[in-house]
């Protein structure tokens, strides 16, 4: 069974303990009048991230899927940029660790 979780505080750097097959869903606010939108990328093939936008930009829906066989750690990088610009308006990361009996710490 897939464990679906909602990340309650998106927009801040977070450390998450996870297992293979887990999925995470949350929304990011894109209101603000500047037209800036969120984008995300993962540094690991074992973690997929998808960002869907509403039009006009008011909200980004984020889905993260941890593949079977995930052994961590992995980080997803989020950046909010204005269209056609390299200027970063806001950014944060989500670091994923394989869940074990021990607490994982990101240094």
Predicted stretch roles:
Residues 14-16, 52, 66:
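Outer-membrane beta-barrel proteins
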Residues 1-26, 31, 101-107:
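N-terminal edge beta-strand
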Residues 67-76:
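Glycine-centered tight-turn and secondary-structure capping sites
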Residues 86-106:
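C-terminal edge beta-strand
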Residues 32-54:
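Short, solvent-exposed loop/linker segments at beta-strand-coil boundaries, enriched for Pro/Gly
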Residues 56-63:
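Aromatic sugar-binding surface patches on proteins
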Residues 24, 34-38, 74:
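Short beta-strand/loop motifs in extracellular/secreted proteins, especially
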Residues 79-83:
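Beta-strand-rich extracellular modules
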